[in-house]
Amino acid sequence: MTFKALLLAALVAAPATAQTIRPDQAAFRELYKELVETNTTLSSGSCTAAAAKMGARLKAAGFSDADISYYATSEKPKEGGLVAVLHGNDHNAKPMLLLAHLDVVEAKREDWTRDPFTLVEEGGYFYARGTADDKAQAAIWTDALIRFKQSGYKPARSIKLALTCGEETTFAFNGAQWLAQNRPDLISAEFALNEGGGGMLDASGRPVLLAMQVGEKDVQNYWLEVTNPGGHSSRPVPENAIYRLSAAVTKVGNHEFPVTFTPTTRAF
């Protein structure tokens, strides 16, 4: 088994197929289902619980206690995660890091046609909170390491897996940041593979494209304040501050920003 198989797995796990699945695919489906159906929202879920479930599967596959490191803080006990390592043969080669986040965006049952925390296969697709962002990738990475371990495969460089929390919410405990600041030894690597890319399948389910993200969007926030001479609301003036502000916002909404090529996009 080569690292190409790991990347191909990321492509194959997109739309669900109705055909009979192999035993190894069924094992992945079971892992994926368990992870998706574990509530990891900030309000009522637990990334720590999800990490423990994935850790238990890794250990059952043959990973030792020393190969799996759990982390959480006393202030945020439910927002923990894990780092696991599959040791390679070349001790001079720096590891690769597989990164995925376990937390998901809030999901209110009344807003969903289906239960957001029950994995449903329908019309060739999986439905539930986190099926794509980012539990598909977390499940793929975990399953890949399990398969490698069970087959006895040892890569040249070690492979590290980091399952973290806090990606979806700005003010939440950020597991990836905490690891970088407090346990850089756990995630030290030559390079990392994270979410942001994507794949494409043809009509028969064959992978035909693997896209890679090479940049991240950024934002700019502006505070707009409009004033006008005071007066009583019973006698509104034509130059009302609210009208002027709404007109400005409308202009921004109607503006089409030009397409800009950066050195990165030009290279591709």
Q: Where do the language-model regions lie?
A:
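Short Gly/Pro-enriched turn/cap motifs at secondary-structure boundaries
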Residues: A72-E75, E168, M212-K217
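Acidic-enriched catalytic cores of C-N bond-cleaving enzymes acting on peptides and small amides
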Residues: P184-F191, G198-R206, Q213-N221, S233-F268
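Sec-dependent signal peptide recognition
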Residues: M1-A9
